[in-house]
A protein has these predicted regions:
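Bacterial Sec-dependent N-terminal signal peptides
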Residues: 1-27
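Membrane-proximal, proline-rich intrinsically disordered regions
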Residues: 17-63, 88, 114, 351-373, ...
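Long, intrinsically disordered, low-complexity segments
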Residues: 17-18, 97-100, 182, 187-189, ...
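Conserved, well-structured interaction surfaces
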Residues: 37, 42-43, 50, 74-151, ...
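Short, surface-exposed recognition loops and adjoining beta-strand edges that mediate ligand/DNA contacts
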Residues: 58-74, 150-165, 201-242, 256-341, ...
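Extended amphipathic alpha-helical segments enriched in small hydrophobics
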Residues: 138-139, 247-249, 443-492
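Flexible, polar/acidic helix-loop-strand segments at domain edges
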Residues: 366-451
Length: 591
C-alpha cells in the first residue's frame, strides 16, 4: 500500500459559479513523493517530534500524594480517585508513541533514497544525521511506551510492548504479541547505539577543517559543509547526548524494584550509563549552581537564543517570548490566577529543616506552630505557604481559613481557591503581571531533560550498586552527588555543615530514603512522582493532606483519598487494542 498523507486546505473565497462544479486539485501526496522533495520527507520525521509527551507540562502530580487540583473535571483527579480504567487512561502513551514510531519507520525506509543536497558530501551528512535522529527518537518513544505500559501478564511474565521496526502496510500482521521487557530495553539500547554512531554529541559550529570528524574529513568535507548539517541551527534536535540520556533513563527504569526481577538489569549498569553523561560535564563539579531555580532565572531565560541551553538543561522546549498562561492558571486568586495546582501537606512535610534534618527528627528544631520557619529554602521556592509574598507588588498571600478579604483562603471559592492551604510556586515567573484589565507576559521555557535528573539517577543507582560512598569508575559517589545538591539548595547548620547527611553516609538504607526524598523535592511538579512511586514499589494510596490555619493554629486534614488497586503499579494496555488483537496480552488486573 502506498501510504497516503493528506493535507487539508480550507477555501475561503469562491470566485465563480463554475468553481462549485469543478473538481478541486487534490493536495494528497504519497510517501514516495518525498524522494524528490526533501522538505516533505523531513516532515515525516518532524511529525514524530510533535508527539514528544514532554513538549508541554502535564502536572500529573495531581494523581499522586504531592498535589490536588481545584478543577473538578481534571482527568488526573478522576484517575486518582477511582476512575482509572484501560479505556480511560490519562497516562496513556500507546496511541501517540506508536504513531510516532510508525512515522519514524516510514522515514527510515526511504531516507537513503532521498536527495537531501546537490553536494554529495553534504547529502551524505544530512542522510546520516536524519537517520541518527530517527533512531534516537524511536528509542525515546519506546522508553515512554515501556514506562507507561510494561507490566506482568497473567502468566507471571514481565512484558513490554511490541517492538515494531518495519513499515506497516495493509498486508501487515497487526496482531503482534508483546515483546519481553528485557527485549524492549535492549531495543532501546540498540537504537541509542545507532544514534550515537551517526550523531554529534551536540550541534555546534566548528571553525577549522581539522575539527571535522574523520568519517567525513576523509571524504573531503570541510568545516563549512559540516556546519551546514551539524551546526548551531539544529541544537533543539535529537543529538548524541540526548540519545545517551534516554539510554540512562531506560537503564534506571529496568534496574528499579518493580522491574528488576524480569529485566536482567543491574544497578551498576544504570549508574554507569548515567555517570557517562555526567562525566561529560565534569561530574559533580558540573552541577549548575542555579539549576534548582531554572524556571525563574530571568536573565538566563531572557537571553536564550538559537537553541542554546542553560547549564542545567540537557534538552529543553523552545522559548515562548511573552507567555503568561501558566501564571493565569496557577497564581493565587488575589494575583488574578486560578490557583489550579495545590501542593499537599505530604509534600510540604518532605522538605527538611534548613539544617538538613527531617522535620520528624528530634534534632531538627521543627516547631509545629511555626511550621515554615527555618525550613529548607526550596520550600519557599516551590510552594506558596501562608504568609508568602509574591508578585510584582510583593503581595502577602493569606491561605488561612480565617481569610475573608479575598479568595486566597482555604476553600473560599470552588475552582479558584486552594484546597490544601498551599499554591504552586515552581514554574512561575513572578514578574508576570496580571490584572482585571491588562496582562504583561515574560519569556518561559520548559525542560525535557535536566541534568539534575541525571545526577539523581546516578545517585540512586550508585548507592544501590556500590553503597553511599562507592564511586565505581566515575570518581564520585551517591553521597558526593547528594551533598552537592543539598549545598546548592542552601542546606546547612550554623557551622555550614550538613550533619544529617554526614550521620547517614555509611547507611545504604537511609541514604536510599534520602536520595528518594531529594528526588521528590528537586523534581516536584515535573512529572516524575507518579512513575517513581510505581517503579519503587511504594504505597500508592497515601491520602492527600492539607492544612487548615485558623486562629493561629495549624490542623492537618485529609483532602482527597487515593484509590489505586495494587495492580495499578503497572499501567494498562488500551482496552481497544486488546479487543482488536488477541495476541496482545493485558497486564494482570486490568480488563
Amino acid at each position: 500500500m502506498k501510504k497516503i498523507l493528506t493535507v487539508c486546505v480550507a477555501a475561503f473565497l469562491l470566485v465563480g459559479c463554475d468553481d462549485l462544479f469543478t473538481p478541486a486539485i487534490e493536495n494528497n501526496k504519497q510517501v514516495s513523493d518525498g524522494l524528490n522533495d526533501p522538505l516533505y520527507s523531513e516532515g515525516i520525521l518532524a511529525n514524530a517530534y510533535t508527539r514528544n509527551p514532554y513538549n508541554s507540562q502535564s502536572f500529573n502530580d495531581v494523581a499522586t500524594d504531592d498535589a490536588v487540583t481545584n478543577q473538578t473535571s481534571n482527568s488526573y483527579l478522576k484517575m486518582a480517585t477511582g476512575s482509572w480504567t484501560s479505556n480511560n487512561n490519562p497516562m496513556d502513551q500507546w496511541g501517540s508513541c506508536k504513531a510516532a514510531i510508525h512515522y519514524i519507520n516510514l522515514f527510515l525506509a526511504q531516507v537513503d533514497q532521498v536527495s537531501w543536497a546537490n553536494d554529495p558530501i553534504v547529502n551524505k551528512m544530512f542522510c546520516d544525521r536524519l537517520k541518527g535522529e530517527a533512531y534516537g527518537l524511536r528509542a525515546m518513544f519506546n522508553f515512554y511506551m515501556l514506562q507507561a505500559h510494561a507490566g506482568y501478564t497473567e502468566d507471571g511474565h514481565l512484558m513490554g510492548v511490541p517492538i515494531v521496526e518495519e513499515v506497516e502496510t495493509e498486508t501487515s500482521n497487526f496482531n503482534y504479541p508483546r515483546n519481553a521487557f528485557d527485549e524492549c530495553i535492549q531495543a532501546i539500547y540498540d537504537d541509542v547505539q545507532k544514534a550515537e554512531d551517526l550523531l554529534p554529541l551536540d550541534y555546534e559550529n566548528i571553525s577549522s577543517d581539522s575539527e571535522v570528524p574523520e568519517t567525513y574529513r576523509s571524504e573531503g568535507a570541510n568545516y563549512s559543509q559540516y556546519n551546514i548539517v551539524f551546526g548551531n541551527n539544529f541544537r533543539t534536535r535529537m543529538s548524541g547526548r540526548i540519545a545517551l540520556a534516554f539510554r540512562a533513563k531506560a537503564a534506571l527504569l529496568a534496574a528499579s524494584p518493580a522491574f528488576a526481577d524480569g529485566s536482567n538489569a543491574t544497578w551498576a549498569e544504570a549508574a554507569d550509563y548515567n555517570g557517562e553523561i555526567l562525566d561529560l560535564i565534569g561530574g559533580v563539579a558540573g552541577l549548575a549552581a542555579n539549576g534548582n531555580t531554572w524556571y525563574k532565572n530571568a536573565d538566563e531565560i531572557n537571553n536564550l537564543t538559537g537553541g542554546s541551553n542553560p547549564p542545567e538543561m540537557l534538552w529543553r522546549n523552545g522559548k515562548d517570548a511573552t507567555a503568561y498562561s501558566l501564571e493565569q492558571a496557577q497564581f493565587p486568586p488575589s494575583l488574578y490566577g486560578s490557583g489550579q495546582i495545590n501542593p499537599t501537606q505530604n509534600l510540604v512535610d518532605a522538605f527538611p529543616m534548613a539544617n538538613g534534618y527531617p522535620i520528624s527528627d528530634a534534632a531538627s528544631g521543627y516547631d509545629a506552630q511555626n511550621p515554615y520557619t527555618n525550613r529548607d529554602p526550596r520550600l519557599n521556592l516551590y510552594i506558596v505557604v501562608n504568609g508568602t509574598t509574591m508578585g510584582t507588588d510583593g503581595k502577602t498571600i493569606d491561605t488561612s481559613a480565617d481569610n475573608t478579604s479575598n479568595n486566597d483562603g482555604l476553600n473560599r471559592e470552588n475552582g479558584y481557591s486552594t484546597r490544601t492551604g498551599y499554591y504552586l510556586r515552581k514554574h512561575l515567573r513572578e514578574d508576570v503581571y496580571l490584572s482585571s484589565t491588562t496582562t504583561s507576559g515574560q519569556p518561559h521555557y520548559s525542560p525535557r531533560i535536566r541534568y539534575t535528573e541525571i545526577f539523581l539517577n546516578y545517585a540512586e543507582a550508585a548507592n544501590e550498586a556500590w553503597g553511599p560512598t562507592g564511586t565505581g569508575t566515575h570518581g564520585y559517589s551517591a553521597y558526593d552527588v547528594i551533598k552537592a545538591i543539598r549545598q546548592r539548595a542552601g542546606i546547612k547548620d550554623e557551622n555550614g555543615n550538613d550533619p544529617y547527611l554526614e550521620s547517614i553516609k555509611t547507611d545504604q538504607t537511609k541514604m536510599r530514603e534520602l536520595i528518594r526524598n531529594e528526588r521528590r523535592l528537586e523534581l516536584c511538579f515535573e512529572g516524575f512522582r507518579f512513575w517513581d512511586l510505581r517503579r519503587w514499589d511504594l504505597n500508592l494510596n497515601e491520602p492527600a493532606k492539607g492544612v487548615r490555619i485558623s486562629g493561629g493554629t495549624y490542623q492537618v486534614f485529609d483532602v482527597e483519598s487515593r484509590t489505586y488497586n495494587d495492580f495499578m503499579r503497572f499501567g494498562p494496555i488500551p482496552y481497544s487494542e486488546v479487543v482488536k488483537f488477541d495476541a496482545l496480552e493485558q497486564n494482570v488486573g486490568w480488563k
